[in-house]
Amino acid sequence: MSEPNLPAGVERREIGGETRLATRGPPVYGEPTADGWRAWDPGRSKLGGMFELGFETGLSGGETVLYLGAASGTTVSHVADFAGPTYAVEFAPRPARDLVEAAEPRDRLFPLLKDARTPKRYAHVVESDVDAIVQDVATRGQAEVAVRNARFLADDGRLLLAIKARSEDVTVEPETVFEGALDRLRETYEILETQRLDRFHEDHLGVVATPK
């Protein structure tokens, strides 16, 4: 079953006796499957949580995507199931090995063992004017990472960002962290939507933005 805020290729399907968000593709992280569809667990995916909460992501399916903070491939593998070329940036070697494994059966998923804080090191690989940047980087300076990578985003593209407050400063209230991050983002982006992701991810803020 499709919904207005879900891109083509992302549906709600009956899997394991429950109606779940799902994409078509080989499983990656032990998720339940049925008839070629794999359940997308919003508790393990910030973007999955954003879809569950009804964010207007601007995604329709088939987009070119730059994914920052791909980790072991849990979320980006789902993205590559419904998107077009998907560039997955991950710096830590251990999760990057899992990411490469997740990419093997997906000809649209391109792992890059790079640091999202230094986009010039992968600028020669990533296409310009990507349709969307999806970011889940659990380090200090998350807004700065989004600003530095804005160079790749099309004028009408979308930034889909999850800000983890505790990665910025555990001594500061999350709301204060979020406001500071949004102030930095507003220097480069127009903020279209924000919403707390606490239903699935404690002390996280989901952000949808577009270049100014």
UniProtKB/Swiss-Prot annotation:
<dbReference type="GO" id="GO:0008649">
    <property type="term" value="F:rRNA methyltransferase activity"/>
</dbReference>
<dbReference type="GO" id="GO:0008033">
    <property type="term" value="P:tRNA processing"/>
</dbReference>
<feature type="binding site">
    <location>
        <begin position="136"/>
        <end position="139"/>
    </location>
    <ligand>
        <name>S-adenosyl-L-methionine</name>
    </ligand>
</feature>
<feature type="binding site">
    <location>
        <begin position="74"/>
        <end position="75"/>
    </location>
    <ligand>
        <name>S-adenosyl-L-methionine</name>
    </ligand>
</feature>
<dbReference type="InterPro" id="IPR029063">
    <property type="entry name" value="SAM-dependent_MTases_sf"/>
</dbReference>
<comment type="function">
    <text>Involved in pre-rRNA and tRNA processing. Utilizes the methyl donor S-adenosyl-L-methionine to catalyze the site-specific 2'-hydroxyl methylation of ribose moieties in rRNA and tRNA. Site specificity is provided by a guide RNA that base pairs with the substrate. Methylation occurs at a characteristic distance from the sequence involved in base pairing with the guide RNA.</text>
</comment>
<dbReference type="GO" id="GO:1990259">
    <property type="term" value="F:histone H2AQ104 methyltransferase activity"/>
</dbReference>
<dbReference type="GO" id="GO:0000494">
    <property type="term" value="P:box C/D sno(s)RNA 3'-end processing"/>
</dbReference>
<dbReference type="InterPro" id="IPR020813">
    <property type="entry name" value="Fibrillarin_CS"/>
</dbReference>
<dbReference type="InterPro" id="IPR000692">
    <property type="entry name" value="Fibrillarin"/>
</dbReference>
<keyword id="KW-0819">tRNA processing</keyword>
<dbReference type="Pfam" id="PF01269">
    <property type="entry name" value="Fibrillarin"/>
</dbReference>
<keyword id="KW-0698">rRNA processing</keyword>
<feature type="region of interest" description="Disordered">
    <location>
        <begin position="1"/>
        <end position="37"/>
    </location>
</feature>
<comment type="similarity">
    <text>Belongs to the methyltransferase superfamily. Fibrillarin family.</text>
</comment>
<keyword id="KW-0694">RNA-binding</keyword>
<feature type="binding site">
    <location>
        <begin position="115"/>
        <end position="116"/>
    </location>
    <ligand>
        <name>S-adenosyl-L-methionine</name>
    </ligand>
</feature>
<feature type="binding site">
    <location>
        <begin position="90"/>
        <end position="91"/>
    </location>
    <ligand>
        <name>S-adenosyl-L-methionine</name>
    </ligand>
</feature>
<comment type="subunit">
    <text>Interacts with nop5. Component of box C/D small ribonucleoprotein (sRNP) particles that contain rpl7ae, FlpA and nop5, plus a guide RNA.</text>
</comment>
<keyword id="KW-0808">Transferase</keyword>
<dbReference type="GO" id="GO:0003723">
    <property type="term" value="F:RNA binding"/>
</dbReference>
<keyword id="KW-0489">Methyltransferase</keyword>
<protein>
    <recommendedName>
        <fullName>Fibrillarin-like rRNA/tRNA 2'-O-methyltransferase</fullName>
        <ecNumber>2.1.1.-</ecNumber>
    </recommendedName>
</protein>
